[in-house]
From Swiss-Prot:
Reaction it catalyzes: 7-aminomethyl-7-carbaguanosine(34) in tRNA + S-adenosyl-L-methionine = epoxyqueuosine(34) in tRNA + adenine + L-methionine + 2 H(+)
Function noted in UniProt: Transfers and isomerizes the ribose moiety from AdoMet to the 7-aminomethyl group of 7-deazaguanine (preQ1-tRNA) to give epoxyqueuosine (oQ-tRNA).
GO molecular function, one term: S-adenosylmethionine:tRNA ribosyltransferase-isomerase activity
InterPro entries assigned: QueA, QueA_dom1, QueA_dom2, QueA_sf
Gene Ontology CC: one annotated term: cytoplasm
Protein name: S-adenosylmethionine:tRNA ribosyltransferase-isomerase
Assigned protein family: Belongs to the QueA family.
Any one Gene Ontology BP term: tRNA wobble guanine modification
Organism: Campylobacter jejuni subsp. jejuni serotype O:2 (strain ATCC 700819 / NCTC 11168)
Keyword line: Cytoplasm, Queuosine biosynthesis, S-adenosyl-L-methionine, Transferase
Pathway: tRNA modification; tRNA-queuosine biosynthesis
Subcellular location per the Swiss-Prot or TrEMBL entry: Cytoplasm
């Protein structure tokens, strides 16, 4: 079988010390590895120098906003419960949500949280997932009211590889400066490096566009099939404004900030759908056909994200750059350093 289709071909070893548990401060001082595909040149710099390397291009950001999706409560028996909200079921008649719950629970069980919030377990699904309904003062909560309540009692859902509890600083650090549309349970992390000053300087030379893709918990789901083509990609809600669609439809060069932007642009390019659910899986055998440049962080081994990067530059080249980044002590994952692919 083609090695590009083998899960084991996307593996690498990373020392725990290179997993960033906190962002660089100030954030634009994070390191940046620049790879020029045309000339096969590599540059090591800092993120604040990003503009020095950018060609003439439109820049696309994901303006999704992370909700405080993790809450702690109790069962009627007093046993402790941790609930991680994934997403609403948008087509259900009653407001129902998909959630992951730690602890043994039964169908129709009621769980209790702060602010008189109650959760009824409607259905037990696979992989620890549950279909649930939220109540406050015996009234069913819709998405908007639930998100408002979670803002009071919830916790920022840090990724599983950050081995600490969320802190006050994460409220700001794990949210991009242009985040506005609530619905993500993970941050589009390439966006986290940008400061207001950097963004203002970018606007002087580049047109900036926003789209929304609500990053789901599926972004952390590991690929388990040795033939990656058998992997079932998670689905995430997206919306692209008309003005952004017109740029995608043009011949203007595009820099996508983050893998979520890339998947949204490429899904639209293939389907001409401006609003819906994206389940596009990009890898070397299904490469991008529209986006020209990519800004992204360093991703987990065997993840769909490292496969997406490989779709841009080839699997072997991707692994070589990761090997170099490890040698040069770059910081990895959500709070880590960045890579610019030209």
């Amino acid at each position: 079988m083609n090695k590009d289709l083998l899960l084991s071909s996307y593996d690498y070893t990373l020392a725990n010390e290179l997993i960033a548990n906190y962002p660089t401060n100030p954030k634009e001082d994070a390191r940046l590895l620049v790879f020029d595909r045309k000339n096969k040149e590599i540059f090591h710099t800092t993120f604040k120098n990003l503009q020095d390397f950018l060609p003439n291009c439109a820049i696309f950001f994901n303006d999704t906003k992370v909700i405080k999706a993790r809450i702690y409560g109790n069962k009627a028996s007093g046993g402790k419960i941790e609930l991680f909200l994934h997403q609403p079921f948008l087509n259900s008649h009653n407001p129902l949500f998909l959630a992951q719950i730690k602890g043994r629970i039964k169908k129709d069980e009621i769980l209790y949280f702060k602010e008189d919030l109650k959760v009824r377990v409607v259905e037990l699904l696979n992989d620890g997932l549950r279909k649930v309904q939220f109540f406050q003062n015996d009234k069913t909560l819709d998405t908007s009211n639930l998100y408002n309540l979670l803002d009071k009692i919830g916790h920022i859902p840090l990724p599983p590889y950050i081995k600490r509890e969320d802190e006050k600083s994460d409220l700001k650090d794990y949210q991009s400066i242009f985040a506005k549309n609530l619905g993500a349970v993970a941050a589009p992390t390439a966006s986290l490096h940008f400061s207001e000053t950097m963004l203002e300087n970018l606007r002087k030379k580049h047109e900036i566009y926003h789209l929304t893709l609500h990053v789901g918990a599926g972004t952390f789901k590991s690929v388990e099939c040795e033939n990656i083509q058998e992997h079932k990609m998670h689905s995430e809600f997206f919306n692209i404004p008309q003005q952004a669609c017109e740029i995608i439809d043009s011949k203007q060069a595009i820099l996508g900030v983050g893998t979520t932007v890339t998947r949204t642009i490429e899904y639209y390019t293939r389907t001409k759908t401006k609003n819906g659910f994206c389940d596009l899986f990009l890898h070397p055998q299904n490469p991008p056909i529209r986006q020209n440049h990519l800004l992204t962080n360093f991703h987990l081994p065997k993840s769909t994200l490292i496969m997406l990067v490989s779709a841009f530059i080839g699997r072997e080249q991707c692994l070589k750059l990761y090997e170099l980044a490890i040698k040069e002590k770059y910081r990895f994952y959500s709070y880590g350093d960045a890579m610019l692919i030209l």
